[in-house]
Amino acid sequence: KPRTSPYSFQGLRAEGLELLAHARSQTGQPIVTELMDSEHIPLFEETGVDMIQIGARNMQNFELLKAVGRTNIPVLLKRGLSATLEELVMSAEYIMAEGNPNVVLCERGIRTFETSMRNTLDISAVPMLKKMTHLPVVIDPSHAAGIAFMVPSLAKAAVAVGADGLMIEVHNDPARAKSDGAQSLTPDQFDDLMATIRPELEFFGKTLN
């Protein structure tokens, strides 16, 4: 994954895909993983990656977008740190114009003048994107705040505003996580959050999958 510092953990590359494939074989859970370079697409296809994530920093990497558009693998497209909604939608169009209609948009917080949290969640992006496009919209409350204690509140707000899904960081030992530990929930905290969100989802006529 792209990191601000070149000295930060960069991911496990091909070995990481092998581990994800093993985890899928044991649990049945699909693989969603980030693509950094179009040269890695054959490896993703060979592994049978279920969904490609295009991260915020690559939202306007148009050659990469066109390359994933020529695959038949669904794409999770994250909004750039300072991108407008129109720019996000146009990036999705780059993918779909190449023949891949399976795009999910992700609001993950944008950069503002506020410094007390990592980013600022643009909760209004959900209804606006649903007005602008037919694509599903999910929210990443973990990156939006960068602080674990805020994740449950933002997740509940995302459900209330109509998000189609949530992307939440979970780690069994956040203090020792290679990346994003400060924003990660423990498994117990995640279970508690899902238990509190379930009634909210039922109120809005949705289910927890």
List each language-model region with its residue ranges.
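Conserved, mostly hydrophobic/aromatic
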Residues: 44, 77, 129, 140, ...
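Glycine-rich, proline-tolerant flexible connector loops at the mouths of alpha/beta enzymes
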Residues: 1-14, 171-184
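Glycine-rich phosphate-binding active-site loops on the catalytic face of alpha/beta enzymes
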Residues: 55-62, 160-183
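Active-site/ligand-binding-proximal alpha/beta "capping" segment
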Residues: 96-161
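Catalytic cores of alpha/beta
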Residues: 38-47, 85-91, 146-164, 172
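Conserved anion-binding
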Residues: 2-3, 56-124
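Glycine-enriched alpha-helix->loop->beta-strand junction motifs that scaffold or abut catalytic
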Residues: 43-52, 67-75, 96-102, 133-136, ...
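C-terminal helical cap(s) of enzyme catalytic domains, especially alpha/beta-barrels
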Residues: 172-206
